[in-house]
Amino acid sequence: MQIHKLCFLALFLANAAFAVKFNFDSFDGSNLLFLGDAELGPSSDGVSRSGALSMTRDETPFSHGQGLYINPIQFKSSNTSSPFDFKTSFTFSITPRTKPNSGQGLAFVIVPAADNSGASGGGYLGILNKTNDGKSENNLIFIEFDTFKNNESNDISGNHVGININSMTSLVAEKAGYWVQTLVGKRKVWSFKDVNLSSGERFKAWIEFRSKDSRNTITIAPENVKKPKRPLIQGSRVLNDVLLQNMYAGFAGSMGRAGERHDVWSWSFEN
């Protein structure tokens, strides 16, 4: 029994030694890597900065970029072990500059390297390209907040949230929205509230992974709404074959021919 306790303590201390925890209420450029067109978002005056992390630039068709935490994060004790638990939350907004909306969307990403040279704009969200889309050696996972229906990716709509592994085709996707529970008589009833991701409104997202049962949950709601008790997406997917020992976490986004802003306003992460 004593040996088991010592082994558990050693494992706990090893995991704790590599734990990462941060909370950005806004962004000033420190602790971030800017790839492609990602930048500190401009304010309406065009001179000062808004405090947001922006993935795209209005004046550049098919603009795309990635904004990553400056240091790699340890997601596993080794490349062959099970991943650690992790959770992240952030507020974001997607604001089209033209009508109809030209897309494309924003994503939370976990990628193997701080390098987006193999990424394209448009429907590839600044993450993949036509050649590497779907390849298992990509070793990446992302949660997409998609604002344009791309038939080649089998998108369910132009306003959805999806879990993607190595591919622009989502493993699971749901229309954007959140669940609320109300009392009808003596019964508690769930009802679904639609949201428009490209309304320019700020939304908050919560993404959680629990290693012991490989449970993934994604929840979204308007910024001023308390975290819903029922996730938008929940399910199990073993990530041992996807996550490497050390990877980068952050955001990616892209637009089509016309302007669309993809801004992240705050971000917290913990593993």
Swiss-Prot record:
Glycans are attached at N79, N129, N151, N196. Induction: By oligogalacturonides and the diterpenoid compound sclareol. Accumulates in response to mechanical wounding, chitin, methyl jasmonate (MeJA) and ethylene (ET) stimuli. It comes from Arabidopsis thaliana (Mouse-ear cress). Expressed in rosette leaves, inflorescences, roots, leaf veins, carpel heads, and silique receptacles. Transmembrane segments: none annotated. One of its GO terms (biological process) is cellular response to chitin. It comes from the Eukaryota. This is Lectin-like protein LEC. Keywords: Apoplast, Ethylene signaling pathway, Glycoprotein, Jasmonic acid signaling pathway, Lectin, Plant defense, Secreted, Signal. Belongs to the leguminous lectin family. One of its GO terms (molecular function) is carbohydrate binding. Plays a role in defense responses triggered by jasmonate, ethylene and chitin. Its main location: secreted. CDD domains: lectin_legume_LecRK_Arcelin_ConA. It is found in: Secreted, Extracellular space, Apoplast. Gene3D superfamilies: 2.60.120.200. Residues 20-270 are annotated as: Legume-lectin like. SUPFAM superfamilies: Concanavalin A-like lectins/glucanases. Coiled coil: none annotated. GO terms for cellular component: apoplast; cytosol. Residues 1-19 form the signal peptide. The lineage of its organism: Eukaryota, Viridiplantae, Streptophyta, Embryophyta, Tracheophyta.
